[in-house]
């Protein structure tokens, strides 16, 4: 069980926040069909909420058929159709760049899309994290530093260069790519986006920009749930961190928005609508 977390944000119903987070983990394949869930008491300690709130969240998931609870037995994940689907092959290769603030759910969206389509998923943290941590330590910095001038000016640009090289190599091989990273600076720069559009077009591919919207309190819940060491500074200074976050930000070019707030639609359903739109656009080219 992970270490205790700070209290969950209270502006949205707590049970709904927890249920949505668990549902996203099921759809993203992090929680597998038949997997045993921790007890209500363990989950309550993990989320720093009451057992009653956990039971409410589990009831919401049970009503959707995502969790099964039997008398005197542990709750288990119920997702029998969770196996990866056959690969979706659009006419033209597709590149889906997914951006969003920390805790917005962009990686979960990428995983859901990858499971639905069979397309490669290129996540910045997965591809670069261990190298970044080693580089930071060589500079005498904490491996979890993501705020220093050294990280922002020297290491972060190299992370994105590596990510985009991996994307380009897949395109050169005729493969689709799902690319996930914050992209906050990049998506604010129209020139940067146009350069990537040109690169994709020259390789016979179509680029789609996706921004994951999430309200501040739900982002806080997701960051806590992730419980990653690199988020420690954000969590310890959350209000200060949020002063630099514009939840209403949108890229200055045509793009699609996925709403991952509690009041938004189910992420998996939004992901499937996105796939339909991508394949439809590809056929029309």
Locate each region found by the language model.
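Extreme N-terminal segment that seeds HTH/winged-HTH DNA-binding domains in transcriptional regulators
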Residues: 1-37
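A short alpha-helical element within helix-turn-helix/winged-helix DNA-binding domains
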Residues: 36-47
């Amino acid at each position: 069980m992970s270490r205790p977390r700070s209290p969950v944000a209270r502006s949205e119903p707590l049970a709904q926040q927890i249920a949505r987070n668990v549902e996203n983990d099921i759809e993203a394949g992090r929680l597998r069909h038949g997997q045993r869930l921790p007890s209500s008491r363990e989950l309550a300690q993990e989320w720093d909420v009451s057992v009653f709130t956990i039971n409410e969240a589990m009831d919401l998931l049970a009503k959707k058929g995502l969790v099964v609870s039997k008398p005197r037995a542990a709750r288990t994940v119920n997702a029998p159709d969770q196996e990866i689907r056959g690969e979706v092959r659009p006419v033209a290769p597709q590149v889906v760049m997914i951006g969003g603030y920390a805790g917005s759910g962009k990686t979960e969206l990428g995983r859901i899309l990858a499971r639905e389509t069979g397309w490669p998923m290129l996540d910045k943290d997965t591809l670069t994290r261990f190298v970044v941590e080693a580089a930071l330590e060589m500079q005498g910095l904490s491996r979890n530093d993501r705020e220093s001038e050294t990280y922002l000016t020297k290491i972060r640009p190299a992370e994105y260069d590596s990510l985009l090289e991996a994307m380009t190599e897949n395109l050169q091989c005729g493969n689709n790519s799902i690319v996930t990273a914050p992209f906050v600076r990049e998506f604010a720069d129209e020139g940067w986006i146009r350069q990537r559009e040109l690169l994709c077009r020259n390789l016979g591919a179509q680029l789609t920009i996706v921004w994951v919207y999430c309200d501040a309190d739900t982002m806080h819940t997701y960051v806590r749930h992730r419980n990653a060491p690199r988020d420690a500074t954000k969590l310890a200074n959350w209000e200060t961190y949020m002063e630099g976050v514009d939840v209403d930000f949108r890229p200055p070019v045509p793009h699609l928005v996925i709403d991952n707030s509690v009041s938004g639609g189910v992420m998996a359903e939004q992901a499937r609508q996105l796939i339909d739109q991508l394949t439809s656009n590809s056929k029309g080219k």
